[in-house]
């Protein structure tokens, strides 16, 4: 049966299955977890899909002559299964029993209590502790884009507007959203496809009610939620697209979580100009957050610099690296803090030891505010808040203004910490109905009910023992179920010993069940106490939760302070352990690095290996704006260029850097163009990707930008590639004025330094010794004389006969030997087991042999040869040479 079954088919179902179909109809885009006793069950297509993903057994339930596919998972283990489904980009609707069985006629009432989506995750077991989990809502028109970023588990909420899709993708890529919310009917819109193509990590796509994106309605919804008269405080009065996206995101949170979302207590507008900008491609190429190898943290800059001890700090550090600062005062404030902590090893270790005891304040507060938390969350929150005064005691010793500023938010919650410490049991249960959440001595009435419940159970045990002695039935047991309450169970072999005052209630296969007036009296006493105790505990829990909700803004501020302190501590620990130095960051356009190292590569070297440091100086004011770097492919050009970009990024994030000294003139953007693997799978050729990214750089770079270009033009023919590379370099020098490192295999580009005053040549030094080539990985002034491609091929393990043949062909080509058509000859070898009549001389590159007799040179060819001989090579630029060559080609055609 499919979910569009007709009314007649639905009417033929059992009442429970009809209830399932009614609920499912309200959530057609979600897998429905339907609570039946101790299991969540799934039916029909949901069951088939879930069983495949979760690798659980698919069974069937009878429906007349048909079988309904079904599967299920235990409710106590559901979070793990839900996490796997959500990680596949699916939504899961949780349908719970909202009343106790037997409280009324008919089946138990059930409702969806929340919908879990990739961007709406609250459970600790499903969330990745060190990563944020953002929903991105987007709207657009012919004037631009609006977006809102909402982290449901922490309450973080931002909105922005962007003039185009490239700028929007750049902003979204900083937080790597897990889910994209678009208006109804827009999931397959070309704009959405274009946006997804620009994001390295593709989010799941969901649709929200189109009306919720409408700016006027969304603005009213936001004003109501935040209880304000206007959105001017959030900077959204003049940003209708951003306001529309923000309203839709907030509505999606409330609709899926069935809550008021009180922890979302602030909204900020994200401005593009305040930070160092990087597009998604540049961030990926530099491996800032994850490795290109496997997408993991290991092998990335974040993996090296993350020495945080809290989840809060880990997420903050990732955010700092994804979006470095653009403000000199803020950069210097972080550097001051890192400098102080890096020089205080005792303070560092003391602070790290305390912070390890602090839980995820943001997400604990978020779960409790959304009604998804339990007593264990209260306990964890209380223990974490109790550590904050110890953190304050360490930070109060510091001189850094930034570190001192953290003490205020960390000192604002002593009453809540004390309350939770007194109120919550040391080891509370997972569920609210199990009892034992509240600490003894916190509430007098609860203590009385607990004592009464405990003593009542003792009385029941006494009754059991007394009845055993009175009847002589040693196997007699006092048991309980929800239908009969407490009863005496007697095996059938002992029925002849049952006293006459026993009242029979039920017969089973092996026993009879009885009650007595005394047992019913004590049952009422015990059950009444249990019910009252349970109800009072839940009431007290809700009162404590309300205290947390009211303190949510202060908890969020404390969490921000913990995260900032932990991220600064991580920078300081790296500086001390790795030998980093404080960079000088100023408003100039200089970039000078002395003995710089690649922060990731140096950490991955084997024992006994050491990284070769390099000096780089870019300063347009001193005729050093664009560096053309030549040298063999394995010599380390790409490593040097990447380390320069990473050094600038680290400095503006507030970190010390891997260098003996560094001066970084503030960068507004970092661009890289180094590879096309990510886009090849999307149907673009290597060369098209290369040109698209280069175009983006040339259109958006400024004289404050830092540009890394690696092998521009390699994806096309030699002459086309050289021409494009030359023109790009000229444009960067003459028009853009940006600081740039330009690695190339076109050695002709070294001549740019003779034509352009701010171009300098660097090459990677190579040493030839005993017929072997040693790559020294050291930058030296000047251009490379050759590429050493065959030596690289040898190092890569090509068979010796292939390497030897390549040397022979190279010598032949480099000697300039031409056939009768003026094309280079290639030496021909006798194939193994040679063919009869094979030539042992020279064969043209295209397989042509000279004509029999004569020179084979036509008058036109001779004229071209004479023109070539008469050319003054020393006075020609590469472009002049290319023009001459093109002219000669036309004459020969």
From Swiss-Prot:
Belongs to the DNA mismatch repair MutS family. GO terms for molecular function: ATP binding; ATP-dependent DNA damage sensor activity; damaged DNA binding; mismatched DNA binding. CDD domains: ABC_MutS1 (cd03284). ATP binds at residues 631-638. PROSITE patterns: DNA_MISMATCH_REPAIR_2. The keyword Transmembrane helix does not apply. Residues 821-858 are annotated as: Disordered. The keyword Aminoacyl-tRNA synthetase does not apply. This is DNA mismatch repair protein MutS. GO terms for cellular component: cytosol. It comes from the Bacteria. This protein is involved in the repair of mismatches in DNA. It is possible that it carries out the mismatch recognition step. This protein has a weak ATPase activity. It comes from Myxococcus xanthus (strain DK1622). InterPro entries: DNA_mismatch_repair_MutS, DNA_mismatch_repair_MutS-lik_N, DNA_mismatch_repair_MutS/MSH, DNA_mismatch_repair_MutS_C, DNA_mismatch_repair_MutS_clamp, DNA_mismatch_repair_MutS_core, DNA_mismatch_repair_MutS_N, DNA_mismatch_repair_MutS_sf. Keywords: ATP-binding, DNA damage, DNA repair, DNA-binding, Nucleotide-binding. GO terms for biological process: mismatch repair. The gene is mutS.
